[in-house]
From Swiss-Prot:
It comes from Caenorhabditis elegans. GO terms for biological process: mitochondrial electron transport, NADH to ubiquinone; response to xenobiotic stimulus. This is Probable NADH dehydrogenase [ubiquinone] iron-sulfur protein 6, mitochondrial. The lineage of its organism: Eukaryota, Metazoa, Ecdysozoa, Nematoda, Chromadorea. One of its GO terms (cellular component) is respiratory chain complex I. It is a peripheral membrane protein.
Length: 140
């Protein structure tokens, strides 16, 4: 009995401390309009919820961690690789131990061709002129 009493007394202050960290109550969904909506950080999938969304309650206790270095932004910073006059190139992702299969990419059409697995971009300098660099192809 004494042990049960000690456990219940020790749990009381912890519950008070945890609940005292919540300072303000978010607005209800019917109070949110397009003009006053405040969105949380956008994730790599493009998800962002307004402040009244019930899915944000998991971040009341801990902070939401979002990596700003999204892979598609990092790959976009790499310039396309000039493959000279080659009509077909392959992309293996750089190292076979990374799990990237060998993907063959046809470069006959003018424009930049991206690997569907990793996003690396290639172009044929013979078929692609400067004005054609805006054309994007995705090869899966």
């Amino acid at each position: 009995m004494n042990r049960l009493l000690q456990q219940s007394v020790s749990r009381g202050p912890l519950a008070v401390r945890a609940s005292s960290t919540i300072t303000t109550k978010p607005p209800t969904p019917n109070q949110i309009t397009k003009n006053n909506a405040q969105f949380d950080k956008v994730t790599h999938t493009g998800q962002a919820w307004d402040q009244s969304d019930y899915r944000l309650q998991r971040f009341d206790i801990s902070k939401k961690s979002v990596n700003p270095n999204v892979a598609m932004h990092l790959i976009d910073q790499r310039p396309p690789e000039d493959c000279g006059d080659k009509r077909v190139v392959f992309c293996d992702g750089g190292h076979p131990a990374l799990g990237h299969p060998k993907v063959y990419i046809n470069l006959d059409k003018p424009g930049v061709h991206a690997c569907g697995y990793c996003g690396n971009r290639f172009y044929n300098s013979h078929a692609t002129k400067a004005e054609d660099m805006k054309i994007q192809h995705l090869n899966c």
